[in-house]
């Protein structure tokens, strides 16, 4: 089993640019409490600890991992932006905002849809400080993800024993996405396209202002990671 996994790793390394053969092998398995529903078995194959350090809370569930994946992929779009906070529910962002401080970003993200935020997965692109932790602590959330937490903030967030606190590490994402369908797999390159102001084409007689262009690009990043047919409304770098 070990040598087979090793051989597959070597093959995939040298065949990186080839689409002729798909080989998947992973010898790191995490058994989950159950799958999407309690009557389904669930497993995760991958090195979770290479991406996150779990600082607190219960074991992650199958559905938690889906939301954590969606949240992480979304926040990759905002790593170079100012303090940004997103709230995920069922793999979609129900609130997201970029502000001058992470506290403001959280408050504005929550204001986008405070009802759906209940029981969601929260993610920040910067450190969670004490002030922000105090606000988050009043909300029931399944998971909170951040690159770091200050000591006081972490102690506050640990007051809820089941709340999952993850410290994120730099992500080296897969270049392709794979999905099981019928008796095979669908494989495609991940969408890494980045829209800029120069790539926008005005479809009306009214020219957008510089602030409106920023909001358009902001909303477009969210739309890219929203499931199904999508309309994202944004104003002032905040989803509404």
Labelled PLM ranges:
Residues 229-240:
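Conserved structured catalytic cores and adjacent interaction surfaces
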Residues 195-210:
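Active-site/ligand-binding-proximal alpha/beta "capping" segment
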